[in-house]
């Protein structure tokens, strides 16, 4: 069985690629980083280390890699022959890999009618569906019809913290022991594959929103609040009383939405929330505040981790005070080393907070959340 995985970064190697290898797949990584590609091909394996007191290590392999920008013919052949395609490239890169995947699928339709599933394992809602749209935009109507018959794009929700790495071995990757990979079993073409560690579900929405509005929201809240306090790491931030109160308050708010919307009980969600805060406290996982806070324009999007749950709470008649505080803190993130932070501050200087709340967050001045955020900015 061949699994082609786009993205040989830390998530690709330390999470998705590792599980695919352990499930019996011959894993081929597609990336554009020649240094990593050459290392993977030279060694054929790599080490994954658990970020806990035990520091357990396991060797993952055999694997190989190709350059998805320069080895296009080989890439198309792999797509034509693969039993599974996965991605962990970041939401913004999906549109860049859509073109070669589309070309590979055209080749596949000529030689291989076996079902294929393409799973985007990204920090976004509907990643596989989005990738499908990008791919289909590059196909004719006839090609789309042919591919729809045998290619599935199951959406997934992934969760595993991979801290910043400090290893002499460029392939070694440290990951937290906890992980969650949930995949919508109703969206597969053909047989659902047996992948170690995957949870197959009939309704993915609760898992996606629980993860996005707890892990991602909590991480972002800790980062932006920690940055405002001049703290360096997430561990430092979550141990700061005021920051911890801010994070816990935001997760109480998102929890209210999740419990009211889905079948999670209050006790079940509180246990999950406690587990997530415990992950932030793991000193083996401690990440730089500025790294977690980076890309504020994306994270301030109307459906993302801060504005998304806050808007939903407003729709339910609740006032998301802590989430509004988080949005205000994100708007003040001015790290000079982050291009999006620089762009954000330039936008604020040009059009003010009101303009950014409208154009980036999708909030008009008469929205209750708009007013809440402005009140925090004036405080």
Curated annotation (Swiss-Prot):
Could you tell me which InterPro entries the record lists for this protein? 6-PGluconate_DH-like_C_sf (IPR008927), 6PGD_dom2 (IPR013328), Mannitol_1_phos_5_DH (IPR023028), Mannitol_DH (IPR000669), Mannitol_DH_C (IPR013118), Mannitol_DH_CS (IPR023027), Mannitol_DH_N (IPR013131), NAD(P)-bd_dom_sf (IPR036291)
Q: Which GO terms describe its molecular function?
A: mannitol-1-phosphate 5-dehydrogenase activity
The UniProt annotation places NAD(+) binding at 3-14
Keyword check for Oxidoreductase, yes or no.
yes
- Gene Ontology biological process terms, A to Z: mannitol catabolic process
Q: Tell me what reaction this enzyme catalyses.
A: D-mannitol 1-phosphate + NAD(+) = beta-D-fructose 6-phosphate + NADH + H(+)
Its Enzyme Commission number(s) read: 1.1.1.17
Question: Which cysteines are disulphide-bonded?
Answer: none
Q: Give the protein family.
A: Belongs to the mannitol dehydrogenase family.
**HAMAP family noted in UniProt:** Mannitol_dehydrog (MF_00196)
Could you identify this protein by its name?
Mannitol-1-phosphate 5-dehydrogenase
Q: Supply the source organism for this entry.
A: Bacillus licheniformis (strain ATCC 14580 / DSM 13 / JCM 2505 / CCUG 7422 / NBRC 12200 / NCIMB 9375 / NCTC 10341 / NRRL NRS-1264 / Gibson 46)
State the taxonomy lineage. Answer: Bacteria, Bacillati, Bacillota, Bacilli, Bacillales
* Name of the gene: mtlD
């Amino acid at each position: 069985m061949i699994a082609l995985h786009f993205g040989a970064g830390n998530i690709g190697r330390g999470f998705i690629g590792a599980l695919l290898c352990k499930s019996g797949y011959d894993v081929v990584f597609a990336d554009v980083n020649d240094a990593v590609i050459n290392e993977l091909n030279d060694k054929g394996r790599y080490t994954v280390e658990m970020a806990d007191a035990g520091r357990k290590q396991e060797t993952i392999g055999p694997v190989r890699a190709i350059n998805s920008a320069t080895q296009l013919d080989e890439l198309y052949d792999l797509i034509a022959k693969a039993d599974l395609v996965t991605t962990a490239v970041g939401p913004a890169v999906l549109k860049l890999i859509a073109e070669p995947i589309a070309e590979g699928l055209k080749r596949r339709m000529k030689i291989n009618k076996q079902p294929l599933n393409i799973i985007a394992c990204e920090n976004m809602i509907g990643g596989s569906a989005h990738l499908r749209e990008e791919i289909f935009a590059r196909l004719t109507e006839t090609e789309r019809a042919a591919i729809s018959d045998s290619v599935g794009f199951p959406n997934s929700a992934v969760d595993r913290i991979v801290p910043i790495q400090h290893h002499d071995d460029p392939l070694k990757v440290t990951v937290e022991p906890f992980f969650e990979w949930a995949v919508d079993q109703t969206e597969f073409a053909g047989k659902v594959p047996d992948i170690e560690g995957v949870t197959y579900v009939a309704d993915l929405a609760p898992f996606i929103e629980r993860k996005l509005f707890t892990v991602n929201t909590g991480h972002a809240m800790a980062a932006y609040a920690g940055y405002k306090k001049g703290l360096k790491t997430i561990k430092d931030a979550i141990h700061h009383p005021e920051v911890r109160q801010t994070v816990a308050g935001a997760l109480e708010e998102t929890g209210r939405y999740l419990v009211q919307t889905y079948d999670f009980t209050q006790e079940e969600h509180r246990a999950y929330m406690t587990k997530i805060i415990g992950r932030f406290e793991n000193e083996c996982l401690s990440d730089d505040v500025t790294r977690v806070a980076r890309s504020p324009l994306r994270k301030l999007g109307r459906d993302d981790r801060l504005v998304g749950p806050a808007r939903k709470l407003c729709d339910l008649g609740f006032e998301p005070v802590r989430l509004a505080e988080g949005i205000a803190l994100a708007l003040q993130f001015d790290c000079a080393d982050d291009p999006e932070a620089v762009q954000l501050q330039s936008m604020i200087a040009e059009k003010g907070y009101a303009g950014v709340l409208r154009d980036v967050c999708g909030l008009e001045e008469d929205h209750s959340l708009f007013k809440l955020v402005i009140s925090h900015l004036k405080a």
